[in-house]
Amino acid sequence: MSGLRPALSTFLFLLLITGGVYPLLTTALGQWWFPWQANGSLIREGDTVRGSALIGQNFTGNGYFHGRPSATAEMPYNPQASGGSNLAVSNPELDKQIAARVAALRAANPNASTNVPVELVTASASGLDNNITPQAAAWQIPRVAKARNLSVEQLTQLIAKYSQQPLVKYIGQPVVNIVELNLALDKLDE
């Protein structure tokens, strides 16, 4: 019975620290130092949330740049169902999915002169990726330009404006945030 009191007091002390003080401290510091990131990197237009800079959206019209396929096929870009397709490279089902995606992209982008960029036909590990390379965005320019009556030069400049360079040049590659790029396209129409 003599060991019960120190064990109970240690338990209560650690419960207070790990269940109360630590979460409150990290939340307060996150809100203070990184308020935009701590709140989900939400993209707002006035009082309306248009999306998150961290999660892709299902842009399907010809007037929008398309991102990577979502692995959450039933409800595209659903963060609650996040996860990869888990299909191995040797799996025939993956080959069928990629072939179907290539055919759909070729049909939607008949003026594209090069091969379909790989990230437009393969899902990311999370299935929610919001970034593609500037080259994959540029591949879609003819379709978007035709649908929106914009010039190739305008869209090339827009892609360059929304391209983000890697933090360290030799690690990673430039990317374009599809959500931000498509919202900028919508603003051009206003």
Curated annotation (Swiss-Prot):
Domain of life from the UniProt record: Bacteria
GO-annotated molecular function: ATP binding; P-type potassium transmembrane transporter activity
Membrane topology: Single-pass membrane protein
Signal peptide span: none
Segments traversing the membrane: 10-30
Keywords linked to the UniProt accession: ATP-binding, Cell inner membrane, Cell membrane, Ion transport, Membrane, Nucleotide-binding, Potassium, Potassium transport, Transmembrane, Transmembrane helix, Transport
Alphabetized InterPro entries for the sequence: KdpC
Entry keyword rRNA processing: no
GO cellular component, one term: plasma membrane
Coiled-coil stretches noted in the UniProt entry, renumbered to this chain: none
Keyword Nucleotide-binding included in the entry's annotation: yes
Localization: Cell inner membrane
Family membership noted in the UniProt record: Belongs to the KdpC family.
Protein task: Part of the high-affinity ATP-driven potassium transport (or Kdp) system, which catalyzes the hydrolysis of ATP coupled with the electrogenic transport of potassium into the cytoplasm. This subunit acts as a catalytic chaperone that increases the ATP-binding affinity of the ATP-hydrolyzing subunit KdpB by the formation of a transient KdpB/KdpC/ATP ternary complex.
Subunit structure: The system is composed of three essential subunits: KdpA, KdpB and KdpC.
Identification of the protein by name: Potassium-transporting ATPase KdpC subunit
Organism, scientific name: Escherichia coli O81 (strain ED1a)
Organism classification: Bacteria, Pseudomonadati, Pseudomonadota, Gammaproteobacteria, Enterobacterales
